Amino acid sequence: MKTTFLEFEQPIAELEAKIEELRFVQDDSAVDISEEISRLASKSQQLTKDLYANLTPWQVAQIARHPQRPYTLDYVREIFTDFHELHGDRTFADDLSIVGGLARFNGQACMVIGHQKGRDTKERALRNFGMSKPEGYRKAKRLMELADKFGLPIFTFVDTPGAFPGIDAEERGQSEAIGHNLFVMAGLKVPLIATIIGEGGSGGALAIAMGDSVIMLQFATYAVISPEGCASILWKTAEKAPEAAEALGLTAHRLKALGLIDKIVNEPLGGAHRDPKSMATMLKRALAESLRQFQGMKTSELQARRHERLMAYGKFKETEGR
């Protein structure tokens, strides 16, 4: 698949287009231009390194939304085996913006749950662009409770702009569904390992992300609101999204410094979409390390640790004024 370049990546796009053009010419030419192609390829790689070493929070937000970025089912195919998808919330409907089911991780039975956005227009509409309704969160809750019943560790993958804000979702109890999920996750007797793989948007993300360990990909985001939404509220225009992204502190390194996530998994040069298989390999290693941390831990110890973790959020110190 041809790489889609973001607006701030246009200098890289121009170089890659030139390289592609030279490769096409070389196929029908007796002149050897492989040296020039190699030179431009090295230049493109260095430019990518320089650009990605100095990303702004707004640029990171754009990478997190990249249309070719790996989604939950992409990681499921690469990381897990024997995946068997389970459907429906047993109350209203089957929300396809959340996928989940039984699988094996390194041979061990587990439960996998995650947001799924969709690749083309038809699938995006079918999956509601990854914005879940109450039935999606209730499906996730059902699968968590099933895993808890059979003693299976839970892996969740977060990638959503946020919970669906439609009237029908509110009528069916959107906030109650999210709140109930938080209640269930707090009391699980099995470990839950959450990974932010793209957008982590507000309560819609938190509804499946209250893990014993929270992992975040290098160019993923996690915030209470989207930069555009924040800008529209504070400045009455979405054009201030870059400033809002800076103020929200939505990047992995900022959140790690605040103690809100536990681990950052570096992405391949240019983002996860440039090399999905390598990204999946690195993430699988991180998931295995996190799971080992909780294996053999008593239920009481696991729950006590989780309680301490949750109670530690929002701590602050007061300093005397001068």
Curated annotation (Swiss-Prot):
PROSITE patterns in the cross-refs: COA_CT_CTER
Pathway terms, separated by semicolons: Lipid metabolism; malonyl-CoA biosynthesis; malonyl-CoA from acetyl-CoA: step 1/1
Subunit architecture: Acetyl-CoA carboxylase is a heterohexamer composed of biotin carboxyl carrier protein (AccB), biotin carboxylase (AccC) and two subunits each of ACCase subunit alpha (AccA) and ACCase subunit beta (AccD).
Ranges in a coiled coil: none
UniProt cross-references to HAMAP family, sorted A to Z: AcetylCoA_CT_alpha
Broad EC category: transferase
Catalytic activity: N(6)-carboxybiotinyl-L-lysyl-[protein] + acetyl-CoA = N(6)-biotinyl-L-lysyl-[protein] + malonyl-CoA
Protein name according to UniProt: Acetyl-coenzyme A carboxylase carboxyl transferase subunit alpha
Primary residence: cytoplasm
Compartments (UniProt record): Cytoplasm
NCBIfam families: accA, AccA_sub, PRK05724.1
Keywords assigned: ATP-binding, Cytoplasm, Fatty acid biosynthesis, Fatty acid metabolism, Lipid biosynthesis, Lipid metabolism, Nucleotide-binding, Transferase
Gene Ontology terms: biological process: fatty acid biosynthetic process; malonyl-CoA biosynthetic process
Signal sequence annotation: none
Entry GO MF terms: acetyl-CoA carboxylase activity; ATP binding; carboxyl- or carbamoyltransferase activity
Function: Component of the acetyl coenzyme A carboxylase (ACC) complex. First, biotin carboxylase catalyzes the carboxylation of biotin on its carrier protein (BCCP) and then the CO(2) group is transferred by the carboxyltransferase to acetyl-CoA to form malonyl-CoA.
Pfam family, one: ACCA
